[in-house]
Design a protein with these regions (language model features):
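FAD-site-proximal beta/loop scaffold in flavoenzymes
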Residues: 248-279, 363-437
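A conserved FAD-binding loop/helix module that cradles the flavin
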Residues: 433-459
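Iron-sulfur cluster-binding cysteine motifs and their immediate structural context
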Residues: 42-67, 86-119, 165, 172, ...
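Rossmann-like dinucleotide-binding cores of NAD(P)H-dependent redox enzymes
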Residues: 163-166, 170-201, 206-207, 295-341
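Glycine-rich dinucleotide-binding loop and its adjacent helix/turn
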Residues: 119-135, 194-211, 239-301, 408-418, ...
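N-terminal Rossmann-like FAD-binding beta1-loop-alpha1 element of flavoenzymes
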Residues: 139-165, 291-299
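Feature captures the FAD/FMN-dependent oxidoreductase FAD-binding
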Residues: 72, 135-136, 140-144, 196-244, ...
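Ferredoxin-type iron-sulfur electron-transfer modules in oxidoreductases and energy-metabolism complexes
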Residues: 17-35, 57-89, 106-133, 262-263
Length: 461
């Protein structure tokens, strides 16, 4: 039956890409994009839109792609999304828009993410920019953090005529998009920098190297700098560890540090002096997308890489596409296993891991079956580098320097889901700073929600 399978997307061959940092997925060309768009049934009650956290008008943009009207398709997408070239690459479409596509009932869903990426890339290559607000409305808003939540909130507010300034702690804008996601999944200069420039083209100002809570506080921004509202999108950058013996050894990294050195500080390039030690044999602890990113990065730096995860393959939280790519590239999965100790040599360097085998017991609070240790099953894995990918928490610097800002026991800022409003008047928050580490698109959705909340707040002030 015609249209059951999607147009294949071109990729680098596994044996080639495992030795370079070029983008794995090569995307659609114009002919392929039009052919894939023609698979869309243009449903009147489009379920795909219900799966999109930023509410892109998916049938409308795909209808324009069908006709070859790529510029119009871009403007439809950019009405809702500030980062389409990013989302088309890293969003978990399989559980969101594509997961609700009617085509998926009797075949493969329409490749919505790949079409979004194509449109955004086409627009960038042809110099097409999002439409700017005609005039300012006289209100100043500060945005803390230039990650997906901050960029989205700032972009949406700028479109409504607000005078928006983003304050970024690092020397480069992009947040987790530049320090957390590898080049082979999300090119920095070609894609992320261009998306940031598009947000700036809307009139948003970005000040880098400004640590809010240290250089200036939120109270000072509002009381002395004239900002009438503040959005906190500072992310969750503090890594978690297991608390097992040997974690302080040299050769133990958090995935956050390992990826930041490579992605932001370009440790993988010979013309940069950023120190990194991938070693010959790397153990990555964890099973999420960040673990896959760390493992695939270490592989490209020449190491044999093992992913050690305490549950089975069905329970891996990483996207299936990322797991598939990791396996293709030769990453070894040691599943239903968990480290109990990091082994250290006499000089203080990692020499291996002691690991215990696990089995799945009863479901835990998340609905997943709890891993249970199998007594007497411990053994040792040789390794000279261990990368811990166990999630991250928000940095308490902002919350500890802002009077009246409530946080929960996990140090996450408490914000209303419907508006992004916090306990402090005029201060809004969203993304990982509120939820803990989550996806790019969920952070964008939170930034979008907060922009609406801020707009309503200032209109009624």
């Amino acid at each position: 039956m015609e249209g059951l399978t999607r147009v294949p997307v071109r990729e680098q061959e596994p044996e080639v890409r495992a030795a370079n940092f070029e983008e794995v997925c090569l995307g659609y060309n114009e002919e392929e994009a039009v052919a894939e768009a023609k698979r869309c049934l243009n449903c009147k009650n489009a379920q795909c839109m219900k799966g999109c956290p930023v509410s892109i008008n998916i049938p409308a943009f795909i209808a324009q792609v069908k006709e070859g009207n790529f510029e119009e398709a871009y403007h439809i997408i950019s009405e809702s999304s500030a980062l389409p070239a990013v989302c088309g690459r890293v969003c978990p479409q399989e559980s969101q828009c594509e997961g609700k596509c009617i085509r998926g009932i009797k075949g493969e869903p329409v490749a919505i993410g790949k079409l979004e990426r194509f449109v955004a890339d086409w627009a960038r290559e042809h110099g097409i920019k999002p439409k700017k607000a005609e005039k300012l409305n006289g209100h100043k808003v500060a945005v803390i953090g230039s990650g997906p939540a901050g960029l989205t909130c700032a972009g949406d507010l700028a479109k409504l005529g607000y005078d928006v300034t983003i304050f970024e702690a690092l020397h480069e804008a992009g947040g987790v998009l530049i320090y957390g996601i590898p080049e082979f999944r999300l090119p920095k200069s070609k894609v992320v920098a261009a998306e940031v420039e598009n947000v700036k083209a809307l009139g948003v100002k970005i000040e880098t190297n400004v640590v809010i809570g240290k250089a200036v506080t939120i109270d000072e921004l509002m009381e002395e700098e004239g900002f009438e509202a503040v959005f906190i999108g500072s992310g969750a950058g503090l890594p978690r560890f297991m608390g097992i013996p040997g974690e302080q050894a040299m050769g133990v990294f958090s995935a956050n540090e390992f990826l930041t050195r490579n992605n932001l500080m370009k440790a993988f390039r010979d013309d940069y002096d950023t120190p990194i030690k991938a070693g010959k044999k790397v153990v990555v602890v964890g099973g999420g997308n960040v673990a896959m990113d760390a493992a695939r990065t270490a592989k490209r730096l020449g190491a044999e890489v093992h992913i050690v995860y305490r549950r089975g393959e069905e329970e891996l939280p990483a996207r299936k596409e990322e797991v598939h790519h990791a396996k293709e590239e030769g990453i070894i999965f040691d599943l239903l296993q968990n480290p109990t100790e990091i082994l250290v040599d006499e000089d203080g360097w990692v020499k291996g891991c002691r690991v215990i085998k696990m089995e799945l017991g009863e479901p835990d609070a998340s609905g997943r079956r709890s891993p249970v240790e199998i007594p007497g099953s411990e053994y040792e894995i040789e390794a000279d580098t261990v990368i811990m990918s166990l999630g991250t928490s928000p940095n308490p610097l902002i919350s500890s320097t802002t009077k009246g800002l409530d946080i929960n026991r996990r140090k996450c800022i408490i914000a209303e889901e419907e508006t992004g409003a916090t306990s402090k008047d005029g201060v809004y928050a969203g993304g990982d700073a509120v939820t803990g580490a989550a996806t790019v698109i969920l952070a964008m959705g939170a930034g979008k929600t907060a922009a609406k909340g801020i707009d309503e707040f200032l209109r009624n002030k």
